[in-house]
Structure formats: C-alpha cells, structure tokens
C-alpha cells in the first residue's frame, strides 16, 4: 500500500537562508508576512529524494563526478511515462537552471540587437535575461476577452514578426496564469515559427504539474515543424520541491540546433550535471509517481479552497484557476486601488507577500500571483488576513 504523505505539516523555513522567507525584509520592507510569492512549495521534499541524497552523503568524498547512464535514462523514462514523448538520450543536455538555459540559447542562436518575442503577462526573467544580453524584447500579449480565459493572439504575432525576430520564448504551461496549451495552439505556433525561421525556447518547468485532468503537451512533440525549431527546458525542481538543487536539462531533437546549443554549452563548461542534481533527479523520476499524485491532489484542493473562499467572502475578486502548477493569478481590480496602493495594501495591511502582477508585464498591474503550495492552515490564515484588511477599505 502506498504511503500517505502529510502536506498539512507546517515546517518553519526561517533562518535557513530561504529566499522565500529570509529575504522578506529586503524585498518587502518587513518580515512579518505570510510568504505566498517565490515559486517553491512549503511541503517537505519527498523522503525518497532525501534518502538518496543521504545515502550519497555517507561517502565522505564529493569529488568530480562523471555523468552516469541511469541519470539520463531516468529523464528519458519519466518523459515517456508522463508525456508519451519518446526522447532520445543524445537529445539531452544538463543546464544550470532554466533561465540560464534560456540565456545559453540566446547566446547560441542570436546576436545583440536581435528581437526576441515574449507573451505577457509572463514569467519576468524572460524579459530580464533578453534585455540584459542586449537583445530586444517584442511583446505578443495574451488576449483575455472575458476577464478569465487567456489565449494566444496569433494575428498580432504574425504582424510583429520581421527579419530581426529570431526567437519566441514560450511558457508551457504558462506562468503566471497556469494555462495548459492545447496541441492545436502549439501546432499553430510551430507553423508560424517555421514559416518565419524562428526558434522556440519552450520553458516546461511546470510540465509535471498539470491539474484537474488536464494533460501537458510538450511543444516539440506536436509536429515535425515543432521538433525542428525548438529547444525545450525542464526540471524536477518545481514538482519535487528541490529548486535549491539545480537539476535542469534541455531537450533538443533537431541535430542542427543541437550542434549549436551543445557546442556553446560545452565551450562555456556549463553542460556537466552536478553530483547532487543527478542523485536527486534520478530518485525523483524513478520513485516519485505516487508522491506527485498526492501532492497534485492537495494543490488542487488548495486552489479550490481559495476559489471557494473568494466566491463566498469577496465575489468581486476574480480567481483564475490554473490548469497547471501551484500558482494562482488573481484579479484585484475590484478593490479600486491603483497599482502602487494595491501593492502597499497587500504588504502593510493584509501582511501578505505575493508577487506583484506588474512584474509579469503591464497587463498584470491589478493582479497578484499567489503561491498555494503550502499547508492549508497557513493558506486559510492568509485569506483571513486578506478579509480583515479588505474590511478596512
């Protein structure tokens, strides 16, 4: 019988150099906030990952370690088991983090001054890393015609593409909105990319966290066009709560793109997986199915808890339930506060640390991104604090 994992247990993360907790004063000006911001979870890393690390720690030398076959095979097997995508070993390359992988790809495939397309509101490092590298961000904003449902604007996308556009950065599933893109949408995006000779960098770090019966579709698996024009980035870090162990990887099916990307990564000495990344990844991907199922069930219940609470106490506030992951996009425009006042209200009156929606693009100025990957008692307390603060408006 499978073990029953305890996601209700409250674990004190303060004074562990946790960015989510120990950077509150630096980021928000006070440290008495409930942390609902940084995208890691407050659930214990699963025991089988901890045990695998502990077993390796029993050997007292942590010297240079060569990548081993069972590590790579665990990625291949997991990807096929979870997503029916038959990845080949030679397509895989370790990367020291998803954002760093995107930076590596921009170095490999673009020059300064080239244009990179993003789809805001979207994960803010897409813009930051692009501009920091001297490339130009071009926006293809998502459309939201009813205040709830977002979609890609393919017509606007085609209108902004010119010969300087080289790359589209895709969040698949989307962050912060949690969209699980349909196969048809991804095929259409791939066709546009192929037509205009664009490379799609697909950030799929939330791919193993599809919710409510939704199924993630890997971008590169939807068509030959997608396979030939894409680099996919993934990791076990979100799903198994091991973000501090940098365990990301790239999947590059096309031989031409693979040669360019891998040669750049190898020349920069960035393609060798670290010892503990290999240990943690293999443990997660070979033993993690049941833990993942239970964790996702708990996250779904937390999302429903937030949606039901808001519907009962604050029906004017729109909760956009994600189709994937533990991040909830919430529209607070009904509170009638301007952007700066909304941010101040959340921090200094509700005493909540959420991500300011404006960081994902100007389209998010009246939104907050709430992390619900925490014990339900703490989530309930956060919602109660929000209610108390709203009562003072």
Language-model-detected regions and their locations in the chain:
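N-terminal small-domain helix-loop-helix segment of the aminotransferase-like
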Residues: 2-97, 104, 284-286, 392-393
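PLP-dependent enzyme catalytic core of the Aspartate aminotransferase-like
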Residues: 158-159, 226, 338, 345-354, ...
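A short helix->loop->beta-strand "cap" motif at the edges of active sites that frequently abuts
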Residues: 114, 135, 195-198, 227-228
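Active-site phosphate-binding strand-loop segment of PLP-dependent enzymes
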Residues: 143-214
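Conserved glycine-rich beta-strand-loop-beta hairpin in the small C-terminal domain of fold type I
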Residues: 282, 298-307, 319-332
């Amino acid at each position: 019988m499978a073990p029953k994992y305890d996601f209700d247990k409250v674990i004190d993360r303060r004074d562990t150099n946790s960015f989510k907790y120990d950077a509150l004063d630096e980021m928000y000006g006070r440290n008495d906030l409930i942390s609902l911001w940084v995208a890691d979870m407050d659930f214990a890393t699963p025991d089988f990952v901890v045990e695998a690390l502990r077993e390796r720690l029993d050997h007292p030398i942590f010297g240079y370690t060569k990548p081993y076959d069972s590590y790579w095979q665990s990625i291949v097997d997991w990807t096929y088991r979870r997503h029916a995508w038959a990845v080949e070993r030679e397509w895989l390359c370790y990367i020291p983090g998803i954002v760093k992988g995107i930076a590596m790809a921009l170095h490999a495939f673009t020059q300064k001054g080239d244009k990179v397309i993003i789809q805001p509101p979207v994960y803010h490092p897409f813009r930051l890393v692009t501009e920091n590298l001297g490339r130009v961000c071009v926006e293809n904003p998502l459309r939201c015609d009813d205040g709830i449902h977002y979609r890609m604007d393919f017509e606007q996308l085609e209108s902004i593409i010119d010969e300087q556009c080289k790359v589209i950065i895709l969040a698949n599933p989307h962050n912060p909105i949690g969209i699980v893109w349909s196969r048809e949408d991804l095929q259409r995006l791939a066709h546009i990319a192929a037509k205009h000779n664009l490379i799609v960098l697909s950030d799929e770090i939330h791919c193993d966290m599809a919710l409510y019966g939704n199924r993630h579709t890997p971008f590169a698996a939807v068509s030959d066009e997608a396979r030939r024009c894409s680099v996919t980035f993934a990791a076990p870090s979100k799903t198994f709560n091991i973000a501090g162990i940098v365990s990301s990887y790239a999947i590059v099916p096309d031989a031409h793109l693979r040669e360019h990307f891998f040669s750049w990564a190898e020349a920069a000495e960035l393609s060798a997986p670290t010892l503990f990344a290999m240990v943690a990844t293999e443990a997660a991907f070979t033993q993690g199915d049941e833990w993942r199922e239970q964790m996702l069930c708990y996250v779904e219940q937390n999302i429903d808890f937030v949606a039901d609470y808001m519907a009962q106490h604050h029906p004017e506030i729109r909760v956009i339930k994600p189709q994937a992951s533990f991040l909830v996009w919430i529209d607070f425009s009904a509170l009638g506060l301007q952007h700066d006042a909304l941010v101040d209200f959340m921090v200094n009156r509700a005493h909540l640390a959420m991500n300011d929606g404006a960081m994902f693009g100007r389209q998010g100025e009246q939104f907050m991104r709430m992390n619900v990957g925490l014990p339900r008692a703490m989530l309930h307390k956060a919602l109660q604090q929000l209610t108390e603060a709203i009562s003072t408006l």
